[in-house]
Amino acid sequence: MKVRASVKRICRNCKIIKRSGTIRVICKDARHKQKQG
C-alpha cells in the first residue's frame, strides 16, 4: 500500500474508489494498491 499525495491508475485494471473519505486504488496487482488521505 502506497500513501500518496496524488493517486493515479498505473494499469488498466486499476480502479479508483472513494471509501469513507479516503481515495483508494484497487487492482489485481497488489503492488498497485494506493491510498490518499
From Swiss-Prot:
GO terms of molecular function? structural constituent of ribosome
Protein origin, superkingdom: Bacteria
BP-aspect Gene Ontology terms: translation
Pfam families registered for this protein in UniProt: Ribosomal_L36
Alphabetic keyword roster = Ribonucleoprotein, Ribosomal protein
Q: Which InterPro entries match?
A: Ribosomal_bL36, Ribosomal_bL36_sp
> Single GO cellular component annotation?
ribonucleoprotein complex
Stated family: Belongs to the bacterial ribosomal protein bL36 family.
- This protein's name: Large ribosomal subunit protein bL36
